[in-house]
Every structure is written in structure tokens, then in C-alpha cells.
Amino acid sequence: MQYTKNHIIQLDGLRFFAILMVMFAHFAQWQFDSIVIRSFPFVYGVTLFFVLSGFLITRILIENKAKYEEAERKKKNLVKAFYIRRFLRIFPVYYLTIFVLLAISFPNIREYFWWLVTYTINILQTVENAHPENFQHFWSLAVEEQFYLIWPWLMLFVSRKHLEKVIIATIFIALSSKLLFFFMNWGWLANSSFTINCMHALGLGALVAYWSMYRKVLFEKLASPVITYSVITFYALYLFVQTYFDIKILN
């Protein structure tokens, strides 16, 4: 990987594809007559965003944790600094948007106002297994903010010896929860929106971040062209099979 002042250049390409997938899923996919295009799961762009977020946040926390330990500074100050940065980066624009929509009486804003300001709209979406009208794209932001509430404490106060186990356990719990939702027939939207059920993607990103720092030999092997192209091919086949069965169901 190429780094430029702690910036990983390759991730920009992944962000670009994730943005394209999400935008296409929201604004263009249903405009096509082709059943193949309409059935393709472009919504997985959100999952890619979660993986990237898990990777970046975990790497930032682990790097800063090492610096604070070396300087013998208190970790609670690192947590404080982390939340201040997150607040300044996200909250001003987010809340400005919410209150502008409230001021112009945007449809459904009053109905969902408190869910929006508390970053819990995904919980409502999970309970009702339905998109909140006009605000269906806010759920992923809620998941991210809930992730930020919990993850720094785990990354900073769990010892390095046990950190990898905690991350793997998080992924396992998330996948188990998704299976439970599936077998209980609680709905695909609820399954996708519940915070714990999104932790498999966030956790995967975190695990890759951990390996990139503490298991570099393994990480370099996984980042080899053969492994990379194999994963891409496998994932493409998976999407093809899912699209095929979705088409069969629609027909």
C-alpha cells in the first residue's frame, strides 16, 4: 500500500466505487428496464463504507494509543480528542441539515425529528422493518455514530494481547445476530439496519487494520495480487449468484 502522510491512497479508489454503488442504488437502479441491473445488490456499497470506516478508525485509534503509551499520557485524553475530532467533522453539517429541514417543514421531519437528532433512526428502521419516508438514507450515519460510541473504549483499554480476539469475537457475534434475524424471519431491512448486525463489516475493517500493524507478514500475504484478485473474483461470483436467484424469484 502507498501512504502519504498517514493517507492511504488506495482507499480513495474504494471510496469512489462505494459512492458510485450507493448513488446508483438510490437514484438510478430502478430507472432501468433490465432485470439484471435492477436485481444487482448495489446497496453493498454501504457495506464497503463500513469496512473502510472500521479500518480507518481502528488504525487511527491503535496508532494514537501507541503514541500516548510511549509518552505516558492518559488514554482518557485520547478518547476526548477522538470525540472532539468526530464532533467537528460530522455534527455541524448533520445538525444544520436537520434544523434547516425542520425550519422549512420538510415532509415527515417532525415525525422522525427525535430519531434523527439522537442518531437512532436505524433503530426505528429495525423495529418497523421499513424505511422512514424521506429519511431512509440516514440510517447508516446512525450506525456509524453508535460505532464511535463503543469502539474507542474497546480499542484503547483492551490490551494488545487480547485485541485481535475481541475484534474476531465482534465479527462472530454480528454474523450470529444476522443469522438469528434471518431464521426468525425478522425482515431483510431490519437485519441490515440493526447496529450489531453491521459490526461484521466494521469488524472486518478493524481486523485488517490490526493485521496491517501487528501481523505484517500475514497482511502482506493477504495483500498479494493472487489473494486480492481471488477475493474479487469470489465476491463477483457471489454477487452474480445472488442476482441470478433474485431474478428467478422475480420471475
Predicted regions and their residues:
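Internal transmembrane alpha-helix with an interfacial aromatic "cap," most often the third helix
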Residues: 207-218
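Membrane-cytosol interface segments of multi-pass membrane proteins
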Residues: 1-201, 218-229
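Alpha-helical transmembrane segments and terminal signal-anchor/GPI-anchor hydrophobic tails
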Residues: 220-251
